[in-house]
């Protein structure tokens, strides 16, 4: 019992320390050296890179379909992160899905794959936080990460803890960017 508590305290202390040093929260730092060879597409993003309003706060508020290919053969699980790197608080994370099975190649709108879990977003709620750009178009990034292990996190994990675990386990990634008009 004491060992488990000590491990939790050590892990959380590390996360707090890294957060204070600016190492967690910066997609650039987390992705340094990770190959960008996964292809990411969405039927819900136009060829011009515009995501339909159905996936924003003034629409249905569900997430769009995301498809990917070319994950490495040694992938143990996958994660999808949606963020806005230009938000006043960066990165603002709208959605994290993790422990997606390695054979899975898509997420359908409103349907999380069996066995996958969602973390909290930057707003503090579990699941997808639909974007709501106030006065100008924003660019959102859907990044698919191939992970070398499954994450040992519960559903509803803290956004920084989930982001840190994904960054540490990432072996490859791919990205789709989408604009949402106000």
Language-model features, listed with the residues they occupy:
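N-terminus-centered regions that define maturation/targeting leaders and the start
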Residues: 2, 8, 17, 21-182
């Amino acid at each position: 019992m004491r060992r488990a508590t000590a491990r939790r305290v050590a892990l959380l202390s590390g996360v707090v320390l890294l957060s204070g040093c600016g190492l967690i929260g910066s997609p650039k730092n987390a992705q340094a050296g990770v190959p960008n060879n996964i292809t990411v597409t969405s039927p819900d993003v136009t060829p011009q890179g515009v995501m339909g309003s159905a996936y924003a706060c003034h629409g249905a508020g569900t997430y769009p379909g995301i498809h990917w290919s070319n994950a490495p053969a040694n992938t143990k699980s996958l994660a999808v992160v949606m963020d806005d790197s230009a938000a006043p608080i960066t990165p603002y994370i709208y959605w994290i899905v993790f422990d997606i099975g390695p054979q899975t190649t898509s997420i359908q709108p409103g349907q999380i794959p069996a066995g996958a879990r969602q973390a909290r977003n930057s707003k503090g709620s579990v699941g997808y936080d639909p974007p709501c750009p106030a006065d100008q178009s924003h660019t959102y990034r859907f990044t698919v990460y191939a992970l070398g292990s499954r994450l040992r996190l519960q559903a509803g994990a803290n956004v920084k803890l989930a982001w840190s675990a994904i960054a540490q386990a990432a072996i490859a990634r791919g990205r789709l960017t989408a604009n949402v008009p106000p």
